[in-house]
Structures are given as structure tokens and as C-alpha cells.
Amino acid sequence: MKNLLGSTIKDLENVALDYGQAGFRGRQIYNWIYNYRNKKKNIDQIEVLPLDFRKRLKDDGFKVSDLSIHERNLANDGTLKLLLSTEDNESIECVGIPTEKRLTACLSSQVGCPMDCKFCATGKEGLKRSLKVSEILDQILFIENEMNRKVTNIVFMGMGEPLLNIDDLLLSIRSINEDLKISQRKITVSTVAVPKMINKLSAKSFKILGNCQFTLAVSLHAPNQKIRETIIPSAKNYEIENIIEDCKQYVRDTGRRVSFEYLMLRGVNDKIEHANELSHLLKGFQCHVNLIQYNQIDEVEFQRACLKDLQSFQSRLSHNGIAVSLRKSRGLDKNAACGQLRQNARN
């Protein structure tokens, strides 16, 4: 353990004791990291600690951040996108999305993404590696420091497939909940759906967290297998009917409603017959559909569904008894919206 971010109070007390310090020094480090959310990122800046203790920690390679800000982009609607550099010279992006009462942090879980969804910029360069717990948590602290307010909600909808980094994902959720004091019910984990991993998510959540109170959002984006395979290559390995069955089991195991993300693509999946087919697929269990307007990226020629088709689609789902809402896009002018995050080339 060299990065102290992500450590429990017991971990930090043990670090202090290992260096011949009183246990309360570990609690001081804990407060400095989590309660004060200090903008300073170096061990030797923890001024509540004795100078000699700080020096020994730093000399031994301990730190409180693996990331640095390479670029800031503030959209007209107040959305902030940060391009962060990692210690191994990779790049990740995270987004702060403010409203009057909330600040939502959209977090990355991997450097790049292996899923290569055709409508998404993130997977165009493939997967480099998964993020560590400290790198996930640090995104929250950078957003808070840059926007000068506390994050209230978390969505794992940035770069990467969270369920392919499941252990660090769940350990970061534990720290977000226990250390940053953000309720699990204000955390959403989005997945394009990986075989066997939805069931594994619920089982591991109970093992690591003791419960499973966060929201699972499945990027469905199609009412049938044929359409889904054309826009999500990995769908060939996971039949849509099996995804739904695994989601039903997830609801039974956790008691939590599943959300389905549905990207509206003109002429692809946006017609009334698609709404009826989706309604039939989802009928009979606790779920919710988020309709998402497509956000343009350079490499593909998909287009947004027209407003009339979107409204008709939403109305038909509602008429068919499916809970549905329309997600508003944020940060479009700075490529900070859903599907637009990528490893931007750095100068």
C-alpha cells in the first residue's frame, strides 16, 4: 500500500504505528484525505503530522494521489470535463455535472474500453488497463476541488466497462460510501453487459459491501438481439434474453430495480414497433428505461432520433406500462456528454 487514498481508518492507524507514531496520527491522515478533501496532493503537505513523519512517508514512496490535471474544459451549461494524466502517462476523463442541488461525478473505471460499441468514442482506441481504487476515488476529489462543492451523486458511466474491473469498482464504492459519506443509493454502475458478470456483481457486492444498494444500469440500446449486435459487437457473446433473465435474478437477489439505458438512433431503434418490442421484452419485472439522445462523435454516422419519434417512443413505453424517462444531455459543447469521453491526445 503506497497510495493512502482508499485506505480505511484502520489501515492508516497501522501505517502510523509501523512508523512508531501514535494511532491518532493515522486518524489525522484520514481526516486530511476524506473529511477535509484537501486540495494539496503531497504527503509533505499534511501539516498536522510531524515533519519527520511526513518526510519518512514521502521517502518511502507513500502518496495521496496518482493523477494530475492535464486539461480543464468548462461547458456553457456548467459541466466540467477533466482530462487527467496517470503516473504511467496514460489519460482518463471524468466529468462533473452540476445542478442547483446536486453535483454528479461521472467516473471512469478503465483507461480506454474493450467493448468497442459503435456509437461510443471511448472504445475507439481499445483498452489499456483498469484503474486502481485510488485512481477512481481521486477523480471525485479533483471534481470537488475544481468545482468547489461536494459531490452528491456518482455514475460509473465514464471510460471503461466497470464490471471488467469489478473488485476495484466495489472497493471504491465501499470507500465512497464509508469514507466520502455518499450513500450507495446515489451511486449508479453502468454496464454494457458481460456474460456471468451481473450475477457476479450481486454476489460480490454482498461479500465486499455487505449489501447491494447502488443502482445497476444496463446499456441495452436495442429491443432485440439482431439490432443489438449491429451496434454492440460484444453482444454476440450474450443473448439479449439472457441479459434480461440475469437482470431479473439480480432484482430477486438485491431487491433493487434495474435501469436500462436506451440510446435513440435515427432509423435504427427509434420506431414504434421497436418500442412495442422493448415493452414486451421488459414486461413483468421491476425496471426503468432511460432514453438517451445520441451525442455525435466524428468517426460514425449515426444520427439523433428526431424529437417526434423520441416522444412517440417514450409515450408508447409509458402506455405499455414501462417506467421511462428522458435523460438530458449535458456538456455537449465540450464533448463531455454520454458516449463522448475518450483518451484525448495530449500535446
Swiss-Prot record:
Residues of the Radical SAM core domain: 99-333
EC supergroup of this enzyme: transferase
Keyword set includes Phosphoprotein: no
EC number(s) given by UniProt: 2.1.1.192
Database matches in Pfam families: Fer4_12, Radical_SAM, RlmN_N
Subcellular location: Cytoplasm
Keywords for the protein's UniProt record, in alphabetical order: 4Fe-4S, Cytoplasm, Disulfide bond, Iron, Iron-sulfur, Metal-binding, Methyltransferase, rRNA processing, S-adenosyl-L-methionine, Transferase, tRNA processing
UniProt record similarity statement: Belongs to the radical SAM superfamily. RlmN family.
The protein's name in its UniProt record: Probable dual-specificity RNA methyltransferase RlmN
Encoding gene per record: rlmN
